[in-house]
Amino acid sequence: MSVYSSILSHHRQSFPLLAILIDPDKEEAYLPLLPQLHQVDLVFVGGSTGNSIEPCITKLRAHTNAPLVIFPGNIAQFSPMADALLFLTLLNARTADMLIEPHVHMAMPILNSGIEAIPMGYILIDGERKSSVEI
């Protein structure tokens, strides 16, 4: 069953899922959590920097059978080692390149990798700190 189908199935049955977001750049924060990952239903992996996420995915794989889903902060955060990728569209982006450019650039690598792409739109609300999506 695909990751998305599993999420929908749980939703239809009113079963909650527990998902956590791991920032690969904050190894000191996520390493202590590894022994508890068996309690998690989904693990999102991603952050705001362009560092490789593959070392983090390798460590997570050794501690959980939960699907690993990339929550990309940018186009550098892609790995066919994950189970799925959130194909994100920032709906309140201020520049056109945030709306379409990453999608065009990554469409073929995602398709060729065979990784499950889960379409998702999101809106940033009142971010007090500057992030990778702001100028």
What are the roles of these predicted feature ranges?
Residues 39, 64, 80-81:
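Short, structured coil segments at secondary-structure junctions
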Residues 15-30, 74, 122-135:
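Active-site mouth loops of central-metabolism enzymes
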Residues 47-50, 73-75, 90-91:
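Short, ordered loop/turn segments at secondary-structure junctions
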Residues 16-22, 41-45, 68-70, 85-87, ...:
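Hydrophobic faces of well-ordered beta-strands that scaffold small-molecule active sites
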Residues 77-135:
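Conserved anion-binding
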Residues 1-59:
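Conserved N-terminal beta1-alpha1 strand-loop-helix module at the mouth
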Residues 27, 65, 87-90:
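Generic secondary-structure signature for well-ordered alpha-helical cores
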Residues 54-75, 105-118:
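Alpha-helix-loop-beta-strand connector modules within alpha/beta enzyme cores
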